[in-house]
Amino acid sequence: MTSPRQLAAIMFTDIVGYTHMMQSDEKKAVALLKHYNATLEKWVTQHGGRVANYYGDGSLCIFNSATSAVQCAVDIQKELRQEPVVPLRIGLHIGEVIFEEDKAIGDGVNIASRIQSLGRENTVLISSDIHDKIKNNSSFSTTSLGHFDFKNINKPIEVFALSNDGLLVPERKKLSGKVKSKNNVRRYVYILLSTIVIGI
């Protein structure tokens, strides 16, 4: 039996530094997690999405509309940067999602996860595919952070940061996430150039 597939706007969220929070003040960390879960579910439902998976202190949410997904992310961050502050990072991408045993998987999910991994607290980072869908919407402001080579992703992806009032636009040099090491990139370029030279 073929697993159900759906083209969707995918939103990944993650609480920054949650493991450290648990180690330093478990009671506070648990309270923040409950606040985060309630806020997430409220806004995802309001914007017509659904929470597909929870991952401890993170989540994967699915939307039929890129605009709805991005507005949901903005609303979540707006609420969670108020007291009690939850340091959240969010990444979004559009792609095909495969549903297996109540879990959402697929390349689109992996890319959204990689984009989220770049973020810092109070950031909303989006792929160029999401950006193409919202770039003419005056409700959103964006700043390009450049192209990134993510682990286990075939090609570089341009990532944009939402720059609406109150959101953090991180400096590229301060970003770290699930990206290929510079040595691997150099090795790939060397192999590619060697192949071209041999072909000549």
Model-derived features with residue positions:
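Hydrophobic alpha-helical segments, especially transmembrane helices
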Residues: Y54, I90, R187-Y188
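Generic alpha-helix initiation/capping and coil-helix boundary signal
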Residues: M22, I62, A66, I105, ...
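Bimodal feature
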Residues: T2, H35, Q82, I90, ...
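Generic secretory/membrane-interface signal
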Residues: A8, T19, V51, E101, ...
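Catalytic beta-strand-to-alpha-helix segment of the class III nucleotidyl cyclase homology domain
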Residues: A38, T45, L60-P156, F160-S163
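Long, domain-scale regions corresponding to catalytic signaling modules most often appended to membrane systems
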Residues: L162-I200
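Short, acidic Gly/Pro/Ser/Thr-rich loop/turn segments
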Residues: Y18, F99, L167-V169
